[in-house]
């Protein structure tokens, strides 16, 4: 597919502390965070004017699902708009706490693990056609996804029985299957639950749940952009060498524990290869493929960053990407802090730095401190992100949903929406079914809006 629908869902970690002590349970914090949402949406599961979905997931994790985007820059912008929306809820909730005489700070973390060892996810969605075998898609993708953390992991200090280690990925320790229909109990790499949120005869939604939540915008661009290119190669019938792994679940942990990318992992055919070699194989095929096909500026940026990141890992010169790739930015931050204060990697103060990198409150989070200092590269502009909080992408179905919600709210009409349905809850119960996610103009929706 030359034009694809993308979407990102991020679950956020939440806590409330007072002088370092836990003040409210996650359930209570979530209630404060969502009080404003519930007051206008009558639910903790709502769609917003920008076409996104905001809801409270299992285990009191706020989750933000971006609207459908058909280009990577829009996706990065809307992913960041989700952070800003949640930051707004956080500021509101803190005001309410103060009004009720409760002292404490609320923290929202865009990360994937908490101190108790629980994991929550960043789920990537890619629209693919029904043609071709889904199992072949998964077979080719799994070695790519297992090793992809080398180019876009969020980084993590992991406590192990042998001491603390710096890992590439937060999510790797929590993945237990290759392909499965579960998302929480067994946590596969690819989730196979068949919910296309589109015409099921034409489309399928590839649901990847192995990735980390990224703070750095270029890391998000590379995570989704590289995966899109691999999908395009599979769809075009490019012959890719069989890189199947003997045990993907063991391999994903081995890769995560080795930021040099050199550790040998066993292939299904009995040979061995490193994560670096596997990624270089995918990259070289991608470069050949796009040389023949031609490419746009954003795809060029993805290829350039992919190549530079692998070169940085291969040569050990991390300065090549220390403004763009999360695990490298965070590693540099932690190493500088350790050197300044003469601390071991296992120090609780280092764990604090690790966590503070993911704090979405811009006046407090360490990633945003680096952004203010101009120490990280950007993909989006702040104005774009601000606008995306209330404006949907203009080239996908999200535009129809966003316009419908905006008009219904302005006219104070009762309505129900999901990814495909737009419904006015009046006597006639008029409903429009929007099965084509690429369609941003629809006379039926315009009529429904005009009738309000």
Curated annotation (Swiss-Prot):
<dbReference type="GO" id="GO:0070490">
    <property type="term" value="P:protein pupylation"/>
</dbReference>
<dbReference type="GO" id="GO:0016879">
    <property type="term" value="F:ligase activity, forming carbon-nitrogen bonds"/>
</dbReference>
<comment type="function">
    <text>Catalyzes the covalent attachment of the prokaryotic ubiquitin-like protein modifier Pup to the proteasomal substrate proteins, thereby targeting them for proteasomal degradation. This tagging system is termed pupylation. The ligation reaction involves the side-chain carboxylate of the C-terminal glutamate of Pup and the side-chain amino group of a substrate lysine.</text>
</comment>
<comment type="pathway">
    <text>Protein degradation; proteasomal Pup-dependent pathway.</text>
</comment>
<dbReference type="InterPro" id="IPR022279">
    <property type="entry name" value="Pup_ligase"/>
</dbReference>
<feature type="binding site">
    <location>
        <position position="66"/>
    </location>
    <ligand>
        <name>ATP</name>
    </ligand>
</feature>
<keyword id="KW-0436">Ligase</keyword>
<comment type="similarity">
    <text>Belongs to the Pup ligase/Pup deamidase family. Pup-conjugating enzyme subfamily.</text>
</comment>
<keyword id="KW-0479">Metal-binding</keyword>
<dbReference type="Pfam" id="PF03136">
    <property type="entry name" value="Pup_ligase"/>
</dbReference>
<dbReference type="GO" id="GO:0010498">
    <property type="term" value="P:proteasomal protein catabolic process"/>
</dbReference>
<feature type="active site" description="Proton acceptor">
    <location>
        <position position="57"/>
    </location>
</feature>
<keyword id="KW-0833">Ubl conjugation pathway</keyword>
<feature type="binding site">
    <location>
        <position position="53"/>
    </location>
    <ligand>
        <name>ATP</name>
    </ligand>
</feature>
<dbReference type="GO" id="GO:0019941">
    <property type="term" value="P:modification-dependent protein catabolic process"/>
</dbReference>
<dbReference type="GO" id="GO:0005524">
    <property type="term" value="F:ATP binding"/>
</dbReference>
<feature type="binding site">
    <location>
        <position position="9"/>
    </location>
    <ligand>
        <name>Mg(2+)</name>
    </ligand>
</feature>
<dbReference type="GO" id="GO:0019787">
    <property type="term" value="F:ubiquitin-like protein transferase activity"/>
</dbReference>
<keyword id="KW-0547">Nucleotide-binding</keyword>
<keyword id="KW-0067">ATP-binding</keyword>
<feature type="binding site">
    <location>
        <position position="55"/>
    </location>
    <ligand>
        <name>Mg(2+)</name>
    </ligand>
</feature>
<protein>
    <recommendedName>
        <fullName>Pup--protein ligase</fullName>
        <ecNumber>6.3.1.19</ecNumber>
    </recommendedName>
</protein>
<feature type="binding site">
    <location>
        <position position="63"/>
    </location>
    <ligand>
        <name>Mg(2+)</name>
    </ligand>
</feature>
<feature type="binding site">
    <location>
        <position position="419"/>
    </location>
    <ligand>
        <name>ATP</name>
    </ligand>
</feature>
<keyword id="KW-0460">Magnesium</keyword>
<dbReference type="GO" id="GO:0000287">
    <property type="term" value="F:magnesium ion binding"/>
</dbReference>
<comment type="pathway">
    <text>Protein modification; protein pupylation.</text>
</comment>
<dbReference type="InterPro" id="IPR004347">
    <property type="entry name" value="Pup_ligase/deamidase"/>
</dbReference>
């Amino acid at each position: 597919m030359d034009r694809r629908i993308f979407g990102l869902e991020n679950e956020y970690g939440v806590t409330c502390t007072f002088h370092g002590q836990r003040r409210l349970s996650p359930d209570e914090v979530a209630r404060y965070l969502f009080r404003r949402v519930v007051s206008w949406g009558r639910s903790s599961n709502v769609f917003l004017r920008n076409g996104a979905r905001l809801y409270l997931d299992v285990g009191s994790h706020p989750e933000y699902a971006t609207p459908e985007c058909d280009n990577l820059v829009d996706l990065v912008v809307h992913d960041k708009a989700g952070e800003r929306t949640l930051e707004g809820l956080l500021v509101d909730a803190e005001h309410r706490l103060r009004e009720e005489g409760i002292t404490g700070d609320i923290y929202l973390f865009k990360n994937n693990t908490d101190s108790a060892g629980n994991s929550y996810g960043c789920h990537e969605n890619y629209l693919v056609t029904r043609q071709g075998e889904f199992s072949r898609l998964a077979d080719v993708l799994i070695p790519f996804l297992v090793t992809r953390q080398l180019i876009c992991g969020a980084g993590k200090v992991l406590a192990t029985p042998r001491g603390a280690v710096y890992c590439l990925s937060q999510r790797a320790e929590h993945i237990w299957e290759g392909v499965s229909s579960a998302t929480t109990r067994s946590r596969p790499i690819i989730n196979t639950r068949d919910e296309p949120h589109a015409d099921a005869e034409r489309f399928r939604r590839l649901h990847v749940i192995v990735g980390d939540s990224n703070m750095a915008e270029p890391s998000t661009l590379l995570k989704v952009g590289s995966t899109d290119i691999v999908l395009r190669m599979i769809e075009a019938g490019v012959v890719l060498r069989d890189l199947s792994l003997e045990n993907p679940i063991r391999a994903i942990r081995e890769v995560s524990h080795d930021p040099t990318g050199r550790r040998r992992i066993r292939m299904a055919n009995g040979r061995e290869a490193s994560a670096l070699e596997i990624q270089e194989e995918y990259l070289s095929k991608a470069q050949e493929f796009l040389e023949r096909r031609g490419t746009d500026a954003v795809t060029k940026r993805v290829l350039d960053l992919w190549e530079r990141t692998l070169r940085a890992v291969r040569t050990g010169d991390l300065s090549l990407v220390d403004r763009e790739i999360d695990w490298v930015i965070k590693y540099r931050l932690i190493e500088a802090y350790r050197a300044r204060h003469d601390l071991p990697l296992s120090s609780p103060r280092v764990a604090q730095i690790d966590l503070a990198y993911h704090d979405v409150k811009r006046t407090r989070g360490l990633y945003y401190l680096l952004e203010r200092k101009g120490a990280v590269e950007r993909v989006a502009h702040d104005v774009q992100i601000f606008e995306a909080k209330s404006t949907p992408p203009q080239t996908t179905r999200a535009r129809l949903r966003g316009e419908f919600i905006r008009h219904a709210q302005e006219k104070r009409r009762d309505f129900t929406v999901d990814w495909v349905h737009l419904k006015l809850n009046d006597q006639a119960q008029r409903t429009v079914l929007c099965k084509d996610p690429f369609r941003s103009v629809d006379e039926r929706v315009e009529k429904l809006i005009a009738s309000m």
